[in-house]
């Protein structure tokens, strides 16, 4: 048994979708996404720049910061392949930083859907009983 949908209802739904996508609320949502820290940090890799399909420069990050001096200002990751003053190779520095970051992420408790997962048990963030 099929459901019958009249053409006029499809047209009305199409017009509603068109109106919503062109409205101020939708553009505000798009604008708020573009001003989010994630988009500012990684958005340059997803959107096209003035060069069309040209690959991004190695001396600039996605948010337009210049890293030609070898250090990324935000994360402090050593990007240059020149040897540092302390004699440690840049590959070793990067490897150590990535291992440290992985350890920090591993130790952080995961949060999903209002619950914190610790030791394989699901604990609610809100306590419903008396403590």
UniProtKB/Swiss-Prot annotation:
Q: Where is the composition biased (Basic and acidic residues)?
A: 120-131
* Keyword Secreted in record: yes
Q: Where is the composition biased (Polar residues)?
A: 97-106
Q: Which UniProt keywords apply?
A: Amidation, Cleavage on pair of basic residues, Secreted, Signal
Q: Where in the cell is it found?
A: Secreted
Signal peptide region: 1-25
Q: Name one GO cellular component term.
A: extracellular region
Looking at the record, which segments are called Disordered? Answer: 48-131
Which domain of life does this protein belong to?
A: Eukaryota
Main localisation: secreted
> Which residues does the record list as Phenylalanine amide (modified residue)?
119
Family the UniProt entry places it in:
Belongs to the RFamide neuropeptide family.
This chain's protein is named QRFP-like peptide
Gene source species: Branchiostoma floridae (Florida lancelet)
